[in-house]
Amino acid sequence: METSQIRNGFNKVEVDVVGPLKDLLVRVMKNINTPFKILNETFKINYCDQQETKTKSSFYIQTLDANDKSSLELTKSAIKNIQMQQQQQQQQQQQQQQQQHHDIFQFTQPSSSHNHSNHHHHHHQQQLQQQQQQQLQQQMKTPKLLFFIVMSVGVGKSYIKNIKEEAGTIPILEWFTNYIRSWEEVFKLTSNQVTSHIKRQLLTKACTTGNINLLDEILLSGISKEQIKETQTIGHGIILKSLIVNNLDSIVVSGSMSLLGAVIDNDNDKKGSSLILSKLNLNLFPKSIITACFNLAELDLSYNNIKEIPKEICQLKHLKILNMNNNQLDDLPLELANLTNLKYLAVQDNPLNKFPHHIIEQGTKRTLVFLKNIIEGKKSETWNKVKLMFVGQEGVGKSSLCKALMGSRRRSSSSFAAELQKSGDTISTEGVKIQSIKGKKIDFYAWDFGGQQVFYPTHQFFLTNQALYLLVFKLTDPNFAERVNYWTLQIKANSGLSVPMIFLVGTHCDACTPEQLSSAEQILKENFVKYSRIRQNAISFVSCTNGTGIKELKKILTNEAEKSNLIKSNIPGSYLILEQRLTDRGANSSRILINQNNINQNNNNNNNNNNHNNCNNNENCTTTAATAGTTTMTSTTTTTTNYSNENILNTSSNSLIALFTRSNSNSNLSNNYQKPLVNQKYIDYNDFERECKLSHLAQEEIQGATEFLHNMGIILHYDTPILRSLVVLDPQWLADVMSSLITFSHNWIKNGILNHSELVSIWSGKYDQSIWPSLLKLLEKFEVSYELPNEFPSRSLIPSLLPEEPIDRIQEIKEKLWIPLPEAIESKRVQIFGCQYNFDFMPLGFFPRLLLRILLIKGIDIKTYWANGILLDILTTEDIKIQKLNHKKHSILPNNSSSTSSSTSSSTSSSTSSSSSSSTSSSSTSTTTTTVQIQSSPFGNSTTIVNKLTNIDNNNNNNNNNNNNNNNNNNINNNNNNNNNNNNNNNNNNNNNNNNNNNNNNNNNNIKNIINNFENQNNLNNIITNNFGGKFEIIKKNDFESPLSSKKPKHQVLVTFKNQKSFESKDKDTYKLNVEIRSFNVSNNNDKDFLASLFFQQLLSTIDTLLSGSYGGLKVTRLIPCIHCIEKDPHSEPHLFDINSCISQLLLGKSQLVCGKDSTTPVRIDYIAPDLSIKKIPILLEDQVVCEEQIGVGGFGLVHKGKLILQDKSLVVAIKSYIVGNSSASDIIRKFQEFHHEMYIMSSLNHLNIVKLFGSMQNPPRMVMEFAPHGDLYHFLEKKKNIKWSFKVRLMLDIAKGIEYLQNQNPPIVHRDLRSPNIFLFSLDENAPVCAKVADFGLSQQSLYSVSGLLGNFQWMAPETIGAEESYTEKIDTYSFSMILFTILTGECPFDEFTSFGKMEFIRKIREEDLRPTIPSDCPPTISNLIELCWSGDPKKRPHFSYIVKELTNFYYNLNLSPIPEQKSINDKSPHPDLISNGVPKLQIAK
């Protein structure tokens, strides 16, 4: 076949045109470039004149003149040539047959020499292959007549009929000169004929060379039965020669001929046939078997490299035997279950990494039933893997107990004791170690939790309620009850409402007397058994030295696991497939040996492998695949961690998904399979969802499967905004990463501060340096660490490693700044308030997480902090101005900094400064930029954070919000890049210690000179402290002076946490969080000094958010200390008021309480609980507000129209009243807190598209707000159907601007109840300054990380908020906004079109099937695209409101409308400007 490759990738086929009319045909067809396909190749036909090209093509077309009699002769001549070619081929075949008979005769004679025989066979085999190729090439070179073209170009007699008689079987095409589409007929016939000839040639080639893949492709493309039979005839001769040449040892082309024979048998309707295609090195399953051999009864494809069985195999209805042994199958299709006649399925020695191995081991019938149950959705599988949690203090024998439970049942106690003596009585565990304990019926996944207290904060991420807990303690410890008490409460807190299954296991019973054992048992029964669901067998005493009680404990564990619901007997088979697929990705990769008999042998192998791998600075891991079922399948492999090829998908702080890989080999089912696996430590949730769908899980089943595998310990997934995007496949790896920092075995993290330069000592050799920034970001997600911003060199805070109590420099700072309470009271210059949270229990790690969140609050000056406390100042307006001046005037460069790095550092600081300060603006050059940093060390005041709490220049801040967000993103990227550079520099520094020491000495001298010059210039009014890590900071001396040394206003805050000290303590509230605020040199009558109250409210919101999101199962009581008790006797404990009693008094219209210690002295509620009285807004008097007609009913009470009167002028307002009604006491308190919370949120808002709060009233509580003359959006759309597009877009834009303002607050404000009834209209004129405003902030929350809680009105709610009490972010408002857009667009409520669904069905479809309203077809693409983006099921894909406002603004202008009216300040838009000052009425605050 003559083809050539042309430039655009097509194959060119030359077709000669001969005969009298060739010029006409070539001229017409030369511009035809239509491509066509033969198999997977694309061809184009080139019609050419042989005389012009001087070449001879493989194909030709004979043109004939229908009116010329000579055309008959041309036809006869062409036919004669064809007949001669056929005769030559027949002669060649006869000669071949004669040669075959001769060879058979020679073959039957005895051979004189074996070596000669081998040489003879080899020679003939080569000769045979050469002959086959030569014959094929000769056939391709012989020109083929495709067809005749007969044209009528003249006048006269037509010989067309005679030509057709002579042509015989050769096609004839009549060309009509008056038919302009004749060229299409020519091309169609040409391409068909060329395709037929080429396929015939390829078919012969496939059979002569044994290429089954090519044969399969040809059969699938379609070929005639005649061609198949013709090829089979040719192939029979080749097979015979193959038999002779190879001495019956092998058949060269038997596979292709077998397939060809099966196809012919199928065409003859022969049933029960078999097809053997083994040992042919096939990479693909021949699909032609399915389409052309559907009558097969037996199929053998063993010993190939097939990776997949096609789903279409179910069409082989008669198949009884399928042999796929020794292939590369990774999975089995569900469609195998539809082969009802299949009796034998052989898939041994395949990897099958994505299919449960134990199912296959149980045979064909079990496998087919398993697949069928998945198809039918039956839940009939059993999960016999139980999570076993070993918890307790260090040194009590947890690891030894775990090892004892893993021991062989036949080992004697003496041998067991000898083994323990070699390893020690106790084995120290850092973090969490995961092992497997094999039982007869149950496999236990043993999680051994490190008992050192330093690891306790990280344990919460691994504890689940679907587990058996072994609370291990040492019977010889006299204080064991305190250890048991902590862990029972910890487990209870993590179990939510369910009662956990706790086994109390005392070790070292061999060292105790019977009396001691009896006493311990009595203590446990009286105090701790009540916390466990296990009552009869909850207590066990064992000895890991002599094995006492071990066998009995294992039996108890097995029995209780069987009785409990931990062994799941009705789970979908798809769960097992999902587990296997995740195992292939990296899950279960850290399981330790389960077969005790192989421990010694495997250890020896590991040692040998480790010696071999010592040349690499990589991590050696021993992994075992733990399997269910009765057959133990153990694969112990030593793997070399190679992180040089890792793929970091995204290292940003918003979306961090890194793939950590290591090579591995799997020999579980295949001895010859050595495919390297990629073990990923964690994957993106979207990737996890894809695995779920490949495991045959429906979308609505994914959440249940995720929770199941999480509770079973296979994966870790936390449905919180920060962690939702991650699925941890290897919990052991995560525990190792955490314990690598939070550990007792190194000294690089000093007092909770980690210099990133020390990561070389911690992570070098374990994790590739390129992923260190990603690991730090991952630890931030789990609130284990926090990377300090604007640090050079970079550092991170590890809160759990801070000193437990103030020591050394921390203690010195605290004593100087936080003076004793009696001294402060005696000065008569301080006002004190605060609160106390009491908990029945609080797991370790609570305050470190709270500390991280407090550090993110703006408007504070951190003085120092430790593991259970933080001391800070609330910045005043004057403080902010002084800080700005100090940062501009004085700057000390970090150690080893050059002028270039200085500029970079300043620029970075500038970005952060502008984003965190409401009053800081960027300068034109980096050298004059104000540097604002966060406190980087607990040892001194070096940093300041400025917040909008100061209310300075709010308008400027609003305008700069978008720029600040961009700066923040850039700053994050810069920090990541700096981390990588710093890490690289650290390695270089380690290699050049001598040079660095010299450089450091020089730099230290330079620093000393700078210090001396600075102190001389500033008259020693400042000091310079050297925080470790080469960080020099300027600190004013008066920063560490007593607050009484100055008469300026000062606000101090001390937050401390107290743990339970003794189990025997009689105090029920032994876990306390105390907040104390001291305001010096301020007056209660000074309405400008409300900063302390505002910060107090934000701090309480931060605490409440953490408690509700992560510790919702704990009982919390909030108490308020009596300030009169404190003032009267600061040495004694004050009376404590319950917060509910304060609220109850306020609801009764009373502003005072009575002290429990002194009933004669009233206590003002606004003094002791300023968060319950919003000082930022005026308290209006009764004669200043006139209440008129009722205009609505709110969630808390009634809404009236009224007037705000002052100096004979009035302003129409809306009055929202809190009405108690017949609610329960708890509902009354809750609703009041929400009502009050709405006032708190609104008091800090100042935007034209947010309804303004003018003031509040008491008895009953009321809010006085702006009045919307045109009502709410819901009723407006309900009444008015025809709305101009211009006004629709204006409404959309106004609402978007209001929400954008909310989300740009710091922290962002989440409305949580955005819907059309909460949007109010102030003008129906699209050219008015304001048309729409957002209102009703009763459910709003400020979100540092996330908010949580159940919500209603599911039609408007984001999927992540419906029907589940989980955390979410401000992106839920973006989703609700899409529903508002839809409502404005259509005039209808969301989902009104769906009338056949009940509420629960609605919720399920919204959450699980992405059900959304139908956008009208005439909706402009800009608006429809915006709606679809905003209602994305993935919160991360929903756009920021800056983008939404931009899109709507551009769309507004593109409508050729008038420009959007400039929105003026509230002062200008008010009908009575003299009533308003800074957005607040000029009113006298009521006393």
UniProtKB/Swiss-Prot annotation:
Origin species: Dictyostelium discoideum
Class of enzymatic activity (EC top level): transferase
Cited Pfam families: COR-A, PK_Tyr_Ser-Thr, Roc
Domain COR residues, every copy: 678-872
List of residues binding GTP: 392-399, 448-452, 507-510
Record EC number: 2.7.11.1
Keywords: ATP-binding, GTP-binding, Kinase, Leucine-rich repeat, Nucleotide-binding, Repeat, Serine/threonine-protein kinase, Transferase
InterPro entries linked: COR-A, Kinase-like_dom_sf, Leu-rich_rpt, Leu-rich_rpt_typical-subtyp, LRR_dom_sf, P-loop_NTPase, Prot_kinase_dom, Protein_kinase_ATP_BS
UniProt-recorded name of the protein: Probable serine/threonine-protein kinase roco11
Biased composition, class Low complexity, residue ranges: 897-931, 951-1007
PANTHER family in alphabetical order: MITOGEN-ACTIVATED PROTEIN KINASE KINASE KINASE 20, SERINE/THREONINE-PROTEIN KINASE TNNI3K-RELATED
Domain of life: Eukaryota
MF GO annotations: ATP binding; GTP binding; protein kinase activity; protein serine kinase activity; protein serine/threonine kinase activity; protein tyrosine kinase activity
